[in-house]
Amino acid sequence: MERLIALDVETTGLEISEGHRIIEIGAVEILNREITSNEFQRYIQPNRKVGESVNIHGITDKFLINKPQFDQISDDLLSFI
C-alpha cells in the first residue's frame, strides 16, 4: 500500500528571514492514488501581523487572535503524517 500526504499552507509571506509564518496548514491522505476521508486542518496564531497577504488568502489578524500557536498543533500534525 502506497501512502502519501498532500500538504497545503497559507502564510503571512514568503520569506522566513523576514519573520513570516504559517497561519493555516491542511493535509489530506492519499492511499494507492485515492484521496481518503482522513484529513487535517488547523489555523495558527503567527504572533505577527498578517499584513498584505490577507489580500491573497482572506485570513485576518482578528480571526487568528485566539488560534493556537504552531507548537500547540505540531504533535497533532506529526501524528497525522
Question: Residues of each region from the PLM?
Answer:
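Conserved non-catalytic scaffold segment of RNase H-like nuclease domains
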Residues: 1-5, 9-81
